[in-house]
């Protein structure tokens, strides 16, 4: 008799995706982040659902409803901080997942890669709208500044901003719609993640060597299920240390002050995971130019497959490209630091240099390094 997991229509899908899936025998811990992102997403949806049961999306009560969750709701404080810090863990996993894709040439699966970019954009939009909901000072001013960037769009800019606001400033209508979008988008992310996996399973996983692994596959369960559980437990450990020991480490103290349209905070800055893009935005003196650079800083990922000049897939055996990759990582860390600094000398210059280097590395230096490596190997 055929095993039920192979015969039942629903079990068959789960079986072919998580149990009998043939996986390369040599994938490292860098391949754990896909499943960790799934864990993060489920955690965010569950904690978010419980928060939404007590939150009120109204300018007069939003801030106090969050206070009420933390003070009066049973275990409300831990749900709130797991949701806030869960977002940070989500982005850490996202950046490492994308970094792994860049390093090992996973972008050579174009459908999987492009859906991944759409997922990244959607997640960033969701996180931005979630940050507005507590209606603190940084929520309000962050929403005002970031939505205002759309006014840089020629001709229709102002109308576009007022359409998104639902009025002439960030107000009740803005908060209500942001809450609606913040609630629905994670489910769209869930659907996109399923499509992401669907395309990945069409080709099979890449592996650190970049060499086709069809001749050496092992079943996903138990080898990688146990590895994923270890990863999830490690993630849970880091998250709970953050939540229980320093829940406000990654937040902004200004957000503990209720939103006040009459008082601007001295330094308006987004959450830490947007700082690199914010630094690129600020490094260009022109408004429209800054907005374009901001969008391109993420959208540049879409043309990475076109810039692949190497005869090898990954960077495992390419020391020159490895040096440039880690320079890119250092550059992104520099941009993240600059994004959180005030707009004054020497930070302006450092930000501009780091922004130029970011685009130079991806568009010029890395493709050239690949060509040099090909020639050195006489390929």
UniProtKB/Swiss-Prot annotation:
Pfam families: Cytochrom_B_C, Cytochrome_B. Disulfide bonds: none annotated. Keywords: Electron transport, Heme, Iron, Membrane, Metal-binding, Mitochondrion, Mitochondrion inner membrane, Respiratory chain, Transmembrane, Transmembrane helix, Transport, Ubiquinone. The keyword Magnesium does not apply. GO terms for biological process: mitochondrial electron transport, ubiquinol to cytochrome c. GO terms for cellular component: mitochondrial inner membrane; respiratory chain complex III. Binds 2 heme b groups non-covalently. Gene3D superfamilies: Cytochrome Bc1 Complex, Chain C. Heme b b566 binds at residues 97, 196. It is found in: Mitochondrion inner membrane. It is a multi-pass membrane protein. InterPro entries: Cyt_b/b6_C, Cyt_b/b6_C_sf, Cyt_b/b6_N, Cytb/b6-like_sf, Cytochrome_b, Cytochrome_b_C_euk/bac, Cytochrome_b_N_euk/bac, Di-haem_cyt_TM. The chain crosses the membrane at residues 33-53, 77-98, 113-133, 178-198, 226-246, 288-308, 320-340, 347-367. One of its GO terms (molecular function) is metal ion binding. Its cofactor is heme b. Component of the ubiquinol-cytochrome c reductase complex (complex III or cytochrome b-c1 complex) that is part of the mitochondrial respiratory chain. The b-c1 complex mediates electron transfer from ubiquinol to cytochrome c. Contributes to the generation of a proton gradient across the mitochondrial membrane that is then used for ATP synthesis. Belongs to the cytochrome b family. The cytochrome bc1 complex contains 11 subunits: 3 respiratory subunits (MT-CYB, CYC1 and UQCRFS1), 2 core proteins (UQCRC1 and UQCRC2) and 6 low-molecular weight proteins (UQCRH/QCR6, UQCRB/QCR7, UQCRQ/QCR8, UQCR10/QCR9, UQCR11/QCR10 and a cleavage product of UQCRFS1). This cytochrome bc1 complex then forms a dimer. Heme 1 (or BL or b562) is low-potential and absorbs at about 562 nm, and heme 2 (or BH or b566) is high-potential and absorbs at about 566 nm. This is Cytochrome b. It comes from Aonyx capensis.
């Amino acid at each position: 008799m055929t095993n039920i997991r192979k015969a039942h229509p629903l079990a068959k899908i789960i079986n072919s995706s998580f149990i009998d899936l043939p996986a390369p025998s040599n994938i490292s811990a860098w391949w754990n982040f896909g499943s960790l992102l799934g864990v993060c997403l489920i955690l965010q949806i569950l904690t978010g659902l419980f928060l939404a049961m007590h939150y009120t999306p109204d300018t007069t009560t939003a801030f106090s409803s969050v206070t009420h969750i933390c003070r009066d709701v049973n275990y409300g404080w831990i749900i709130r901080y797991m949701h806030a810090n869960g977002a940070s863990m989500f982005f850490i996993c996202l950046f490492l997942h994308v970094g792994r894709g860049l390093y090992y040439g996973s972008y050579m699966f174009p459908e999987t890669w492009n859906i991944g970019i759409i997922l990244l954009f959607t997640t960033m939009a969701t996180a931005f709208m979630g940050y507005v909901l507590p209606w603190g000072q940084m929520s309000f001013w962050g929403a005002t500044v970031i939505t205002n960037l759309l006014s840089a769009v020629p001709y229709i800019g102002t109308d576009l901003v007022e359409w998104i606001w639902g009025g002439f400033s960030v107000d009740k209508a803005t908060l209500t719609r942001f809450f609606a979008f913040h609630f629905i988008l994670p489910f769209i992310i869930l659907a996109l993640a399923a499509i992401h996996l669907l395309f990945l399973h069409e080709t099979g996983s890449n592996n650190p060597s970049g060499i086709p692994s069809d001749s050496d596959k092992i079943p996903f369960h138990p080898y990688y299920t146990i590895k994923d559980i270890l990863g999830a437990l490690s993630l849970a450990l880091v998250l709970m240390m953050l939540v229980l020991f320093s829940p406000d480490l990654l937040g902004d103290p200004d957000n503990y002050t209720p939103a006040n349209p009459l008082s601007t905070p001295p330094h308006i800055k987004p959450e830490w995971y947007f700082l690199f893009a914010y630094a690129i935005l600020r490094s260009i003196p022109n408004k429209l130019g800054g907005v374009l650079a901001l969008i391109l800083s993420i959208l540049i990922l879409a043309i990475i497959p076109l810039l692949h000049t190497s005869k090898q897939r990954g960077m495992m055996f390419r020391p020159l490209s490895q040096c440039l990759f880690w320079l890119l990582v250092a550059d992104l860390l520099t941009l993240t630091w600059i994004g959180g600094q005030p707009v004054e000398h020497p930070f302006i210059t450092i930000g501009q240099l780091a922004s130029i280097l970011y685009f130079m590395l991806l568009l010029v230096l890395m493709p050239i390094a690949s060509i040099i490596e090909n020639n050195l190997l006489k390929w």
